Swiss-Prot record:
Residues 22-43 are annotated as: Disordered. Coiled coil: none annotated. One of the primary rRNA binding proteins, it binds directly to 16S rRNA where it nucleates assembly of the body of the 30S subunit. This is Small ribosomal subunit protein uS4. One of its GO terms (molecular function) is structural constituent of ribosome.
Length: 200
């Protein structure tokens, strides 16, 4: 399944989550596209709930089905809770860390920064969005990209940086100083549904 590249607001309204990070797309019309007003939806089956939860998280991080499933399988080989490990692995993706540092306003924009070679890891350019960032690694904006307008605009509006990352706005460098705890990740996601979905 290819990565969705259409309007994010449509997916946000269909799944009931904000993919832009602002929540604005849900303020005016907090119901699915195609509905003529906030009419009551049909009752969803257990399978439907599980699938919807999977789609929420997949679109949140902007992954293809194959990338999502591969990461899920990788999480299953780690010690601890499968669902929590899965969410932590998603959070360790380079494009996500770039987003968390405030260098991009959305994960989609962060993915483009990585793809276009604007980001380095420990001084070496990395253009793979799925690269898994380890604790202690230094993420930086390339010197040639320091005046990138998209980065500058994002830094102007970004204020919240999670406690598990550190960022130096003057040097445009940051790092993952520890793995996140479950309580610091998306509260609107029930990862148990996703584990159940793939266990069918």
């Amino acid at each position: 399944m290819a990565r969705y590249t259409g309007p994010s607001w449509k997916v946000s309204r269909r799944l009931g989550i904000s993919l832009s990070g602002t929540g604005k797309e849900l303020e005016r019309r907090p119901y699915a596209p195609g509905q003529h007003g906030p009419t009551q939806r049909k009752k969803i089956s257990e399978y439907g709930l599980q699938q919807a939860e999977k789609q929420k998280l997949r679109h949140m991080y902007g992954l293809t089905e194959r990338q999502f499933k591969n990461t899920f399988n990788k999480a299953g080989k780690l010690q601890g809770k499968h669902g929590e490990n899965f969410m932590i692995l998603l959070e360790q993706r380079l494009d996500n860390i770039v987003y968390r540092l405030g260098l991009a306003r959305t994960r989609r924009a962060a993915r483009q920064l990585v793809n276009h070679g604007h980001i380095t890891v420990d001084g070496k350019r990395v253009d793979i969005p799925s690269y898994q960032v380890s604790v202690g690694q230094v993420i930086s904006v390339r010197e040639k990209s320091a005046k990138n307008s998209a980065i500058a605009e994002s830094l102007e509006v970004s204020s919240f940086v999670p406690e598990y990352v550190t960022f130096d706005a003057e040097k445009l460098t940051g790092s993952l100083n520890r793995l996140p705890e479950r309580s610091e990740l998306a509260a609107e996601i029930n990862e148990a549904f996703i584990v159940e979905f793939y266990s069918r």
